[in-house]
Swiss-Prot record:
Lineage: Bacteria, Pseudomonadati, Pseudomonadota, Gammaproteobacteria, Enterobacterales
Self-association and partners: Part of a ferrous iron transporter composed of EfeU, EfeO and EfeB.
Gene Ontology annotations for the cellular component aspect, listed alphabetically: high-affinity iron permease complex
Molecular function, one GO term: ferrous iron transmembrane transporter activity
Protein name, per record: Ferrous iron permease EfeU
Record key words, sorted: Cell inner membrane, Cell membrane, Ion transport, Iron, Iron transport, Membrane, Transmembrane, Transmembrane helix, Transport
InterPro entries reported for this sequence: FTR1/Fip1/EfeU (IPR004923)
Length: 235
């Protein structure tokens, strides 16, 4: 584990432990703010991936070849670029996991985090040593859609946290009750709650925020890239 990875992990532990020291309302407010930050970061990441997914493989290969051909200093610059890129993703993961942990204090979110880390290690090994080929465009597309649904759940969770903190008390009627169909006490319901923020009996405001975020995000994601951006990439 790199020093930046350790720093990100320690930061996540510190933040998670600190929330337990807050009074209940302040803790809910903190959780809501963390969820909003996570939504912003994840949304930015999705549209960044959408922007670079078309030519990212070719651009990366060209940049690596150019850096390695210029000498040792450029090689170290490449190493540091990868280092800070991984550190940045680690910090994003801290906020993402913290927001997920705040929604469910059971064993499933930590277990999911460990399984995700193990899966990343296996895929990294296969990519580096196994020589498997990955269609980055398709990979970014489907993972981006997945992340948008995760972010929508976090947005709904944020409005729920703000209500519990006493900041938002509008439209708190129960929109529907799915407990008879998919209870959060079931295995699949717990999994959906931990990943997508599923609630068996959400309030009207939670459902509204979920749709208000997700529909424009999906429409913006489905729109073709701007002509200027496409031309600049092809140039």
């Amino acid at each position: 584990m790199t020093s930046r990875s350790r720093q990100a992990a320690y930061s996540g532990i510190f933040i998670n432990e600190t929330t337990g020291e807050f009074p209940q309302k302040e803790q809910e407010l903190f959780e809501g703010i963390v969820a909003v930050i996570a939504v912003v970061i994840l949304t930015w990441m999705v549209f960044w991936m959408r922007k670079v997914s078309r030519n990212v493989k070719v651009q990366l290969e060209q940049a690596v070849d150019s850096a390695l051909q210029r000498g040792n200093h450029h090689g170290w610059a490449l190493v540091m670029m990868v280092f800070f890129a991984v550190a940045r993703e680690g910090l994003e993961s801290v906020f993402f996991l913290l927001a997920a942990f705040q929604q469910d204090v059971g064993i499933w979110p930590p277990l999911g985090a460990m399984l995700g880390l193990a899966t990343a290690v296996v895929f990294g090994f296969l990519l580096y040593w196994g020589g498997i080929r990955l269609n980055l465009g398709a990979f970014f597309k489907w993972t981006s859609l997945f992340i948008l649904f995760v972010a929508a759940g976090l947005a709904a969770g944020a409005i729920r946290a703000f209500h519990e903190a006493g900041l938002w008390n509008h439209f708190q009627e129960i929109a529907f009750d799915m407990s008879a169909v998919l209870s959060t006490h079931s295995l699949f319901g717990t999994l959906m709650e931990g990943i997508f923020g599923y609630q068996e009996a959400p309030s009207v405001s939670e459902v509204a925020v979920w749709f208000i975020y997700l529909i424009p995000a999906l429409v913006a994601f489905a729109l073709p890239p701007r002509a200027g951006a496409t031309a600049s990439r092809s140039a």
